């Protein structure tokens, strides 16, 4: 696994590996689950539909997943979005989606490259 590729996408591979007690196989399995997870699509759909509760649930789930995988850039963005949603600042939370989408796409691309 090329940690430089991951680091460029805001993923601390060393920290993630430490969380997995050094098991690269476990980390790879969880990275694959991240790629298959539907919460980003659910977040986008909920925002489009104005479903605030659904958006909060999806964003909060993504925050936890990214935290567990040491996806620091995404974790920070989702944390901010969840905080805004909980504070009732829906417009600002929605405005974060472009930045979140770019960081998410970077992370997906990096993980895919490392799993090839």
Model-derived regions, located:
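Two-component system phosphorelay core
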Residues: 1-116
């Amino acid at each position: 696994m090329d940690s430089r590729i991951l680091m460029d996408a805001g993923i601390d591979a060393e920290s993630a590996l430490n969380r997995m007690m050094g098991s690269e196989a476990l980390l790879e399995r969880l990275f694959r689950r991240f790629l298959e997870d539907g919460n980003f699509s659910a977040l986008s759909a909920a925002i489009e539909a104005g479903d605030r509760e659904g958006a909060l649930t999806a964003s909060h789930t993504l925050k936890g997943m990214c935290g567990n995988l040491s996806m620091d850039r995404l974790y920070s963005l989702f944390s901010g979005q969840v905080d805004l949603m909980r504070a009732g600042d829906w417009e600002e939370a929605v405005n974060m989606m472009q930045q979140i989408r770019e960081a998410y796409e970077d992370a997906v691309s990096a993980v895919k490259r490392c799993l090839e």
